[in-house]
A protein has these predicted regions:
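Short active-site-adjacent helix-start/loop capping segments
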Residues: 32-34, 64, 88-91
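Active-site SXXK
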Residues: 51-80
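Generic short alpha-helical segment signal, independent of protein family or function
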Residues: 66-74, 85, 113, 129
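Aromatic-acidic/polar surface patches that form glycan- and anion
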Residues: 50-55, 126, 206
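Active-site-adjacent helix/loop patches that line small-molecule binding or acyl-intermediate pockets
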Residues: 2-6, 18, 99-205
Length: 206
């Protein structure tokens, strides 16, 4: 097993309770028509322990963003501009990766899934707002899930739960919808209490 091939992983696996080791692996198999099927494998999974899902949060934020657009009757290709209300936030009105040169929720979601783009995730997170995000997750049965910060740096602490003013425009740059900055109505503490488990990470070069 891979956990016994590298000495550092072998050490962690030997004392998995101390290191709070948990692994979730999803195998994707495609049939002759390219249709995927998924099979999950877990190792030492414990719902009472904290599990940091990292970029996996890009999936629920993308789904909820599309759902919110549908509620607002806004097309996913509408031009999406981001303003700022404090120094750590970013103003965005251009996107050189899109065909028309403008950002949109659709383009941000494409970038999240194609290259796991953290900046794109930050803009979608800001559109949703922390309260909307957690209220909807709770309604869907994910009461213990916490998504409370951007991944592109800059904002810290409470600033991470203050989300930018955003606006949508049609192709003629006519305003469709405007959303003011949003402030979290409460502090979203983790239901498992203290969840700090380390201060570093390893990658393929380690």
């Amino acid at each position: 097993a891979i956990l016994n091939k590298k000495s550092i992983l072998k050490t962690v696996n030997a004392d998995y309770k101390k290191y709070k080791l948990q692994i979730i692996y999803t195998q994707i198999t495609r049939d002759s028509n390219g249709k995927p099927s998924f099979k999950n494998y877990t190792y030492k999974l414990d719902s009472t322990n904290y599990f940091y899902c990292a970029s996996l949060v890009k999936l629920p934020t993308s789904i909820l963003a599309l759902e919110k657009l549908n509620e607002l009757k806004i097309d996913r290709t509408a031009l999406f501009f981001t303003d700022s209300v404090n120094a750590c936030q970013h103003k965005v009105s251009k996107d050189t990766t899109s065909v028309n040169g403008y950002p949109s929720i659709e383009q941000y979601i494409k970038k999240m899934f194609l290259v796991s783009d953290n900046v794109a995730y930050g803009r979608v997170y800001e559109f949703l707002g922390v309260d909307y995000l957690h209220n909807r997750l709770a309604q869907l049965g994910y009461k213990n899930m916490r998504i409370v910060h951007r991944f592109d740096g800059g904002c810290k602490g409470a600033d991470n739960t203050t989300t930018n003013p955003v606006s949508f425009y049609n192709s003629d740059l006519k305003l469709i919808y405007k959303q003011k900055e949003q402030y979290a109505s409460k502090t979203y503490l983790h239901p498992l209490g203290i969840v700090k488990v380390g201060k570093a990470y390893m990658n393929a070069q380690n």
